[in-house]
A protein has these predicted regions:
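Alpha/beta-hydrolase active-site loop signature
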Residues: 1-3, 66, 173
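Active-site loop/oxyanion-hole signature of alpha/beta-hydrolase fold enzymes
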Residues: 1-40, 72-75
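Generic structural signal for small/hydrophobic residues in well-ordered secondary structure
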Residues: 21, 25, 35, 63, ...
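Active-site acidic short loop of glycosyltransferases
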Residues: 26-32, 53-54, 162-163, 189-190
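Hydrolases whose catalytic domains are alpha/beta-hydrolase-1, hotdog thioesterase
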Residues: 44-48
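Flexible "cap/lid" loop of the alpha/beta hydrolase fold
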Residues: 50-51, 56-93, 97-98
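Helix-loop "lid/cap" segments that line or gate small-molecule binding pockets
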Residues: 98-115, 120-127, 139-145
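Conserved serine/cysteine hydrolase catalytic core
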Residues: 127-186
Length: 191
């Protein structure tokens, strides 16, 4: 996510995240879990269920990545060559201050920004930090390309058989379209 945890130079692939999660569960002594994933975390949850099937008791996917090609233009733009040089400008204090002022102005007139716009702005603010920006770009490029998502779990839905799967989605999600939820629901038996 866009939190304050360390951003080491490491493997930011879905398989890497799934392996880190398995290592954490082993360290904590958990043998069976309900895995919950939101956005990229949904992709991690599905990768975890694929790699470490026996650990996975139930799966919850919230506005999950990895279920279709379409994603927002902003994510696709973040994969373009040079994005790592443009992101510091977008995340700069001046641009953020302008965005805050514009949001306040929009609240005065009948145009109200969607909550997702505000959330995206908060996410971009975290990219002012160079290690966070590097981790974001590496992670994004491992799952998205300019044409959309490059990884898909659709060929592995059979692995959810016998595992209760809950799919939750916001109908107005502007990052990953809700159509992915309907497609996954139709393909995942018992979801």
């Amino acid at each position: 996510g866009h939190g304050d945890s360390d951003k080491p130079q490491t493997d930011y692939s879905l398989g890497g995240f799934a392996s880190h999660l398995r290592d954490l569960l082993d360290h904590l002594g958990h043998e069976r879990v309900t895995i919950v994933g939101h956005s990229l975390g949904g992709g991690v949850a599905m990768q975890f269920a694929y790699q470490y099937f026996d650990y996975c008791e139930r799966i919850v996917l919230v506005d999950s990545g990895g279920l279709g090609r379409e994603v927002s233009w902003a994510l696709r733009a973040g994969t373009l060559p040079g994005a790592e040089f443009v992101l510091p400008v977008i995340a700069s204090r001046h641009v953020r201050d302008f965005g805050v002022s514009a949001t306040k102005l929009l609240r005065v007139i009948p145009l109200r920004p969607r909550p997702s716009v505000i959330e995206v702005a908060r996410g971009y603010a975290s990219l002012a930090d160079a290690p966070a920006r590097s981790a974001f770009v590496h992670t994004l490029r491992s799952v998205v390309e300019p044409g959309g998502q490059r990884v898909s779990a659709s060929d592995r839905f059979y692995l959810t058989e016998g595992r209760p799967t809950l799919i939750i989605w916001g109908a107005l999600d502007t990052i990953i379209p809700v159509s992915h939820a309907y497609t996954a629901h139709a393909a995942i038996q018992g979801s």
